[in-house]
């Protein structure tokens, strides 16, 4: 099975976008009502690799994986051998033995591509100098919850050029 990354918004199509948003809204309702959430990620480990500080991204990812039954491992360059010159290739190969997915928050988009190149597990972009696709999804969800569909009456998205191809 081919791994599916979420490095750029272009990694998902309209159908996937709608499915992700629908699932996120459903999970939010369950969480808000205090209802149990199916543990669909039980026995899955998420490696969260941070090169830059984060509050919302870290909390969101860590709570999400835990609520879905998985585990989060938080790493940064100061607590791994990356600080001593270990290559991304070596780090990726070691981590993929233990983790099922990586979330990387980096200063250089090219590092996301390196993690993709050297690992067999999916890569999620937690923010790079080029894009922040998870934030775009969160913004779309927030907009729709507060103002309705992101499409105007003519069917054209009102969010911006990056979303145009999705609708």
Locate predicted features.
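Glycine-rich phosphate/diphosphate-binding loop of Rossmann-like nucleotide-binding domains
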Residues: 50-64, 144-167
């Amino acid at each position: 099975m081919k791994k599916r990354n979420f490095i750029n918004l272009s990694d998902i199509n309209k159908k996937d976008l709608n499915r992700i948003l629908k699932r996120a809204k459903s999970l939010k309702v369950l969480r808000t009502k205090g209802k149990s959430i199916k543990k669909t990620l039980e026995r899955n480990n998420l490696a969260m690799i941070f090169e830059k500080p984060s509050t919302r991204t870290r909390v969101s990812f860590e709570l999400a994986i835990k609520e879905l039954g998985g585990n989060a491992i938080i790493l940064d360059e100061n607590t791994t051998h990356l600080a001593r010159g270990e290559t991304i290739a070596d780090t990726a190969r070691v981590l993929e033995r233990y983790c099922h997915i990586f979330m990387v928050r980096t200063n250089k988009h090219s590092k996301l591509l390196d993690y993709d190149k050297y690992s067999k597990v999916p890569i999620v972009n937690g923010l790079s100098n080029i894009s922040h696709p998870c934030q775009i999804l969160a913004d779309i969800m927030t907009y729709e919850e507060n103002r309705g569909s992101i499409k105007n009456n003519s069917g054209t998205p009102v969010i911006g050029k990056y979303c145009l191809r999705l609708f």
